[in-house]
Amino acid sequence: LPPDASPITLTGYHVEGSITDQVAELSYRIVFRNPGDRRLEGVLLVPLPADAALSGFSMIIAGKETKGELLEASQASSIYQSIVSRAIDPGLLELVGERMFRAKVFPIEPRGEVVATLKMTQTLSKSGGLVTLSVPMRSARFAQGEGGRTSARISLKTSRALRTILSSNSEVRIAREGEHGATISYEEGSTGHQDLALTFS
């Protein structure tokens, strides 16, 4: 490929927020870059868990605020399957049935960056006394490339004493803060992205 045909790269995907009992309020900061010598266009695709409501979105490009659209599960399904069929990420098959947020990213100027911010509110599911949070990190995708770093920092507060808190992801660090709280942090490089899964009671 010619030097100016470099794909868009995801240089940062960062999640911050808080959980109070069963309600999570999360903010996603997504940074992507055009490393080439010509304008490029991309598409931001972010899966939305069934228990999540999009409460805010901001992306300023060339001084103008860009809007996105919420796709219901039936619409999002064909996009997930299309990505899988091109062997970009077979793991996305597990997301079929979930909604998706989509936004066009244009223009991304040569050597330039664009920052998108999404805010979500989730009422977390509870089963057998266990509350579960799933943060879509691995599955965030740009139609023209991926890479960069991912990180998360989430504070947890509960009305009752926190008995158990664990994650299936070995990269997640959990720091207990008294009987009713904890801080969850996670940071990963450009390979092997995983979603953040957390269970507590």
Name what the model sees in each region.
Residues L1-S201:
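Subset of Sec-pathway N-terminal targeting signals
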